[in-house]
Structures are given as structure tokens and as C-alpha cells.
């Protein structure tokens, strides 16, 4: 007699899924397959790939004999072909004017980038020169060298006015990030209202200063981790994925934001920021509006970063972007505004 407690076996039809039919958000590409692509499109002999970083894009070190290069595979839908082309043309422009950057390397057919077909859709890829050197340290000496480098970057970037790239304007820095955050903040109305208010105050302050702000092509992500220092004290820059025409004061404020969000105290950060900004101003002037806007662009950067992360909740998970994430951001903005508000 059959056991009445036993559930009958479920009869299901066989379903077949393939990598092409099941959608993905951000796949991990096999390094052996990428090595084959690199060998074919760049003419490198027996390249070996090591994944260095999986962030907005995927960055790998490529070793072919004694030669070392960097391969970036952009995330699907992150940049249009025109935007990728702008970034690579900007790098070529800077290199041509003597700025030490990780320049793009052409494929065997002369193109600066290609497109591969991943599970989630087309993904652009590009090869870059490898920048030797050590990471910048949190010392006034390194901060000053970085400030000089930033001034040289802006000097060299002034003539570059090519179209085809998103602008690092207040819509990009404040309006769009809030739009990305709002779906996650519905669970935390006590945090949503003060975050919206902080963004409104930041926007009002920067809008008032906007007529006097310097504008031009920017790196867009000018924190110290995107630089290397050679034994000859030459600073090289890489990762121009967030570059675009924008406020020069914002470009500088990214370094300040990076320092103050590393858990250092104000007494530790201030000498670094003073050295960075002082070295920049020795080489390149800033307007009164630029100087007044710097702390407000730190707040804008904090909001931009929160929106950047919130926009990828489906990939990172909402537990990662839960209440503690937004509380940390709001606490930072509140404390920052108390020290540097209008």
C-alpha cells in the first residue's frame, strides 16, 4: 500500500537553456577564450590573461613573452561605441601632448577597440599600455606630485573638444544618481527625505556658482588608485572610463572625496589635500567659484557614487545596498555639510 504522505513525483517537460537564451547581467568571461581573442585581434603570441579587477568593467593583465599590457572589457550597455571612441581619442590626445597615460593600443586591423558577443549582449574591449610604477601613498609629497599631474592633465585637455561623450554636469552628478537610488529608498523613507534634501542643497549651491566654474575635458575618476608613480617621480594616469567634459573643480574634488572616505581623520587628510591643491594651483589657476565649489563637489561625488551602486542592485544584491549603505552615505553628507556647508 503506498504511503499517503509521499508526494507524487512532479512530471515536468525537459527544458533546455543555453547561454544565448538565458539573459545575464554581467558575465565572467573565460580567460582562455579572451586569450584566443587577443591573440587573433592583436597578433600577440601565446598571451596569458590574469583578471585583475571585476568592477564596472573587467580588467585583465595580458602577458605575452616579455610584453605586458592591459585588456579592458566594458560592461554591456555601459558605454556606446561613440563614447568608447571618445575616451580612446582623448587618451591619444593627452599622450600626444606629453601626459603620461595608459594609451590605447590598436588592433592588428588598426581599430582602437572591438566588440565581442557575451551572454548578456555586445561588450566593447580595448587594449592599453601597461603603466609601471608604484601606487601613490598618502603622503604630502605624493599628493603634491599628483596635484602637479592633475594640472598638466587639464592643461593638455583644454584643446580637446570632440563631441560624442556624456557630460559630467549636475544632471549626471546629482539628478540621475537620485533616480537610481529612489527604488531602494522606498523601504527607508526616514533616509530618503534627508538624502533628497542634501542633494537639493548641493545642487542649489553648485548652480549658483556654475557661471564662474572652469569647464573642459576631465578624467572623471581622479582618485589616487588610478595613478602610478615611477622611480623618476613621474605620475601616470589610467582608467579614463568616467572621463568626459565637465567641471574641473569636480575632477579635483574626487581626490578630496577619496581621502575623506578612507576612514582617515581630518588632521590626516588636510595636509594631503593642501599639498594636492597647492601643487595644482602653482601650475594652473582656479577661479574663486572653482575654489568655493570644491567642498560641494565632494558632496556631489558622494551622491554620484551612491547612485552608481544603487543602479546595480540587481547585480550586487539589495542586502549589500540596504539600510547601512544609505545610512553611511547620509551620515557622511551630514557631517561634511556641517563642516563645509554654505
From Swiss-Prot:
Q: Which Gene3D superfamilies match?
A: 3.90.1200.10, Phosphorylase Kinase, domain 1 (3.30.200.20)
Biological process terms in GO annotation: threonine biosynthetic process
Give the matching InterPro entries: Aminoglycoside_PTrfase, Kinase-like_dom_sf, Pseudomonas-type_ThrB
Q: Which GO terms describe its molecular function?
A: homoserine kinase activity
Pfam families per the UniProt record, alphabetical: APH (PF01636)
Into which family does the record put it?
Belongs to the pseudomonas-type ThrB family.
- Report the protein name in the record: Uncharacterized protein DR_0394
Amino acid at each position: 500500500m503506498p504511503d499517503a504522505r509521499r508526494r507524487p513525483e512532479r512530471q515536468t517537460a525537459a527544458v533546455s537553456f543555453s547561454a544565448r537564451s538565458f539573459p545575464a547581467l554581467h558575465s565572467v568571461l573565460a580567460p582562455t577564450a579572451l586569450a584566443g581573442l587577443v591573440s587573433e585581434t592583436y597578433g600577440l603570441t601565446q598571451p596569458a590573461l590574469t583578471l585583475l579587477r571585476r568592477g564596472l568593467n573587467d580588467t585583465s593583465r595580458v602577458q605575452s613573452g616579455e610584453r605586458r599590457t592591459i585588456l579592458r572589457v566594458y560592461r554591456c550597455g555601459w558605454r556606446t561605441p561613440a563614447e568608447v571612441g571618445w575616451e580612446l581619442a582623448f587618451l591619444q590626445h593627452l599622450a600626444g601632448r606629453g601626459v603620461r597615460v595608459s594609451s590605447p593600443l590598436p588592433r592588428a586591423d588598426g581599430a582602437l577597440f572591438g566588440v565581442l558577443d557575451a551572454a548578456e549582449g555586445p561588450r566593447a574591449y580595448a587594449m592599453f599600455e601597461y603603466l609601471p610604477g608604484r601606487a601613490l601613498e598618502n603622503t604630502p609629497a605624493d599628493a603634491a606630485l599628483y596635484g602637479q599631474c592633475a594640472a598638466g592633465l587639464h592643461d593638455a585637455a583644454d584643446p580637446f573638444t570632440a563631441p560624442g561623450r556624456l557630460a559630467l554636469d549636475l544632471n549626471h552628478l546629482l539628478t540621475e544618481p537620485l533616480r537610481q537610488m529612489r527604488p531602494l529608498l522606498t523601504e527607508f523613507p526616514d533616509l530618503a527625505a534627508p538624502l533628497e534634501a542634501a542633494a537639493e542643497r548641493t545642487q542649489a549651491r553648485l548652480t549658483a556658482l556654475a557661471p564662474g566654474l572652469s569647464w573642459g575635458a576631465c578624467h572623471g575618476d581622479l582618485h589616487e588608485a588610478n595613478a602610478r608613480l615611477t622611480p623618476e617621480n613621474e605620475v601616470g594616469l589610467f582608467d579614463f572610463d568616467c572621463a568626459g567634459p565637465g567641471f574641473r573643480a569636480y575632477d579635483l574634488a574626487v581626490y578630496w572625496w577619496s581621502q575623506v572616505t578612507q576612514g582617515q581623520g581630518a588632521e590626516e587628510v588636510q595636509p594631503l589635500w593642501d599639498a594636492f591643491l597647492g601643487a595644482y594651483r602653482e601650475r594652473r589657476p582656479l577661479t574663486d567659484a572653482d575654489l568655493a565649489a570644491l567642498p560641494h563637489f565632494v558632496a556631489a561625488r558622494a551622491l554620484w557614487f551612491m547612485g552608481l551602486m544603487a543602479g546595480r542592485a540587481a547585480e550586487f544584491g539589495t542586502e549589500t545596498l540596504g539600510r547601512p549603505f544609505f545610512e553611511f552615505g547620509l551620515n557622511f553628507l551630514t557631517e561634511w555639510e556641517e563642516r563645509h556647508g554654505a
